[in-house]
Each structure stands twice: as structure tokens, then as C-alpha cells.
């Protein structure tokens, strides 16, 4: 399996009348308006969730100059399972979730949630966030011992650890499979997300 360094959050429209309306618009190549998204019922996660709140809020900010806090019809779900149940029942029109979530809830959709069609037929992606980078091993920019040679050697050491079976066992405690090199610009979206969170916290 090829290692990935990031994932994306998706805004998924469900089988409600509004959900279908938004999906049809996006699938026709039209851009959603603020009126489109603000008139929908949204399911979001708690405010510390990257895929269920932070990055969808960043997407709203980049596309409409708004945040999740500006959505008049947003409810917080206690889990992705309950969010998908609400989407299936039509209680919400859009849910914010991680990119692989539909695969994870495919069986529940036609089982526990009682839907006739598959989750793939009943739902559609109406928004995609910037990349959410996975965990990072970072070093201090101000430490005098952190010269370029040391940084490169440290990075290569972690990559080497992740390339051995023994190393994989050690890093499995973090749910890591291995490491790949990164550059500072990979985390620009994360910096923007953190700035947005700080501005929301200071406004509240």
C-alpha cells in the first residue's frame, strides 16, 4: 500500500430534497452559493475535529468568506455514525466528514439506517477541503543543534525505522505505518486553519 501524507474532508449531500438539489447543481458543474449552503441543514463534529469542523470551516471561509458558526442550520453530531444516520433519515442535508467515511459506513447505510439504495447512489460530494496533513515529526527552528545535516539525518532515521518490521511494531502505537519527507509549505493549510481557530476563539 502506498503511504499518503494527507487526507481531505468532504461535504457530502444526502438523499433529502435539499441534498439532491445541491448535488444536482454541483454535478452539473455549477458553483454553490452562500444561499445554497446556508439554507441547508448541516451535521458537523465538535470544534476540535479537523475533518468534521475545522477544515470544512476553512472551506467555507475560502469559498464564501464565512465559517461554520455562520451557518444558521448546523447541528453537532456526537459521532460520524449518528451523522450518517441523520443524513440517511433526511434530518440533515449535508455532513462534514473524512474522505473515506462513506466506505466505512457503507454496510450501515443499507442495514442499520434502513436505506434501499447504496450509500454511493444516495449521496454526493458537494465540497472538498484543502489537504489535511497527517501527524508530523518536527524540529525546533531556533535550536542551535538543529542544522540542516542533523535535520536530514533525523528525518532519514525515522523513515528507516518505518521501513523495517520491528520499526513498524514500535510506531504502531501512534497508528503510524511509516514516514515520508515533508516541507514546510505542506502545512500552509494547517497554519490557515489554526489562524481561523484563533480568530474564532478571540471573537467568542
Please state what every model-predicted region is.
Residues 1-50, 58-61:
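A conserved helix-loop-strand patch within extracytoplasmic ligand-binding domains
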Residues 37, 87-88:
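Hydrophobic residues within well-ordered alpha-helices
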